[in-house]
Regions:
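NAD(P)+-binding Rossmann beta1-loop-alpha1 motif at the extreme N-terminus of oxidoreductases
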Residues: 1-58, 62-65, 127-130
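Active-site-adjacent beta-strand anchor residues
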Residues: 31, 66, 97, 139-140
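Generic preference for hydrophobic
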Residues: 48, 93, 137-139
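Short, glycine/charged-enriched secondary-structure capping and boundary segments
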Residues: 20-23, 43-45, 77-81, 107-111, ...
Length: 144
């Protein structure tokens, strides 16, 4: 089944991850604060958008984030334009960023309080693993 996925953070790790999701038959839209990263994503046939507002809509079933630090995850999820306030309740949030446990718990609680499913899913395997689609994903979340 093809999912409609919003992917935020298409740097060295996120770009090949999003590309592999596209190759698997999913519909992907991507966003990054770096215009250079968006240009690279576009060259890989990924559909790019210029803002979070253009990315998150009622059609999105999954949001994946791959961000460099907890403060970035916090801003994307909980900030004034945070995606927790924009997604539908049936949307699954997957944070692949390697962030501190406190930030992960804070974001997870905020999502849970709104009835949104979220999993913390940091990865290991580096850029090569992302390119070869061989990353190890360590998943944590509620039993639902």
């Amino acid at each position: 089944m093809s999912e409609k996925i919003a992917f935020i953070g298409v740097g060295n790790m996120g770009n090949p991850m999003a590309e592999n999701l596209l190759k698997a038959g999913n519909k992907i839209k991507v966003f990054d604060v770096s215009k250079d990263m968006l240009a690279k994503a576009k060259k890989k046939n990924l559909e790019t958008v210029d803002s979070i507002e253009d990315l998150i809509n009622h059609e999105i079933s999954i949001v994946v984030t791959m961000l460099p630090e907890g403060k970035h995850s916090k801003e994307i999820y909980l900030g004034d334009s945070g995606i927790i306030n924009k997604v539908q309740k049936n949307c699954l949030l997957i944070d692949c960023s390697t962030i501190d446990i406190e930030t992960s718990k804070e974001i997870g609680k905020a999502a849970n309080d709104k009835g949104i499913l979220m999993i913390d899913a940091p990865v290991s395997g580096g850029v090569m693993g992302a390119q070869k689609a061989t990353l190890n994903i360590m998943v944590g979340g509620s039993k639902e």
